[in-house]
């Protein structure tokens, strides 16, 4: 009986520790998209999706923002607060906005979902390393004459969206292939098109407060 109580106490202590750690989470990759490809209901719809996933993970008390740019002048970097940001395991991925865009600690091991799980990367089946951003490497909106946001996140058919590689791995050693937020345009905006180029309609979520 005594050993049983000790085991239960240890289990509860471990659970409490894990919960406390998760309560500090301020960054994650969505574990699922809304299911309509790059049609996220605009950035507001994407923000709401972040909020729903965060609430399910026990951190819904924070204000969550999707790391997405919109044409012509909504910059992802300006939407996400000041940092620092930590993943579900308590690892700091960036100290502030400048750190995030100059020396981020984002890779397959740290770009975890709100559940604390790794996302499939290059070499995994299926590959899901394409993450929607619609952004330049500096986290800014792309030129308005180039629709790289699938109609500002309202299209699920023709079009294109800029994506990054959460695993920092691509076909070669170029800066683009290793970029977490600005690797290449998708071949379309539908769920199937995103899957066809190594994605699944996922995006980054940051706590803005």
Task: Tell where the protein language model's regions lie, with residue ranges.
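Short, linear, compositionally biased motifs with a strong N-terminal bias
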Residues: 10-13
